[in-house]
């Protein structure tokens, strides 16, 4: 059996909001598999899927660029090791220059950027290495995407840690900005229920079925419970199904219809999203927090 460490219990508690002993027991039953343990706890507690915020550990910036005509744009994430470097002007400018380069070269594969020249003539890789020497931290170009809009593009950057690019048609620039801001706040998975990944939906359906079975109700009632939860889940994770953040009385879908507008696609980047937190000594962390509170 895999060893269940304090840091594993801590991470599961952060993901689920449940008690230490419940988390430790679930990890033991799941053989140390974090995802399986989370699913076990969801079945028992009826909880929703976690936002996995506890796993976001990297520093860096999200930068973006859109051409004046709104037809081309790019979004990029560049990582560093500390918040201090993430606020450095040279680092921020480097990320901005990369976004512009992606647009001018129509590049989405960031691996192709390395040997491309920036405005000053130096290659991306040589500038990156020079920044590493100057700032004393590893700097990596994590991901990026370039757009050729079907309609036109809107972008929203929340500080430099969250970035959204939306391809939409109809409405005006203010609507595009509002939709991008909504996506940053509500973090939908996709535009419509038809775009929800099949494996993700099936996984949630299995969880809902197991949760409903815990009620001990007849099969026909369980089936209705599951379908109700699936419908609610689809509304929560799709852009069109979500209540609009600036007016929760209407959904985004209703807002778009009143403006004769449509959203064809969007990209949402959050700095460090999906990067696993480094294992820390849980006891040492607790002691550090106690010392700081004195």
UniProtKB/Swiss-Prot annotation:
Kindly give the InterPro entries that the UniProt entry links to this protein. Answer: EF-Ts_dimer_sf, Transl_elong_EFTs/EF1B, Transl_elong_EFTs/EF1B_dimer, Transl_elong_Ts_CS, UBA-like_sf
Q: Where in the cell is it found?
A: Cytoplasm
Alphabetical list of PROSITE patterns matching this protein:
EF_TS_1, EF_TS_2
Q: Which UniProt keywords apply?
A: Cytoplasm, Elongation factor, Protein biosynthesis
| A Pfam family matched in the record | EF_TS
Q: Where is this region: Involved in Mg(2+) ion dislocation from EF-Tu?
A: 82-85
Annotated S-S bridges? none
Question: What terms describe the molecular function in GO for this protein?
Answer: translation elongation factor activity
What Gene Ontology cellular component terms go with this record?
A: cytoplasm
Superkingdom is Bacteria
Described purpose of this protein according to its UniProt entry: Associates with the EF-Tu.GDP complex and induces the exchange of GDP to GTP. It remains bound to the aminoacyl-tRNA.EF-Tu.GTP complex up to the GTP hydrolysis stage on the ribosome.
Q: Read off the PANTHER family from this record.
A: ELONGATION FACTOR TS, ELONGATION FACTOR TS, MITOCHONDRIAL
Protein family (similarity comment) = Belongs to the EF-Ts family.
What is the protein's given name?
Answer: Elongation factor Ts
| Gene name per UniProt | tsf
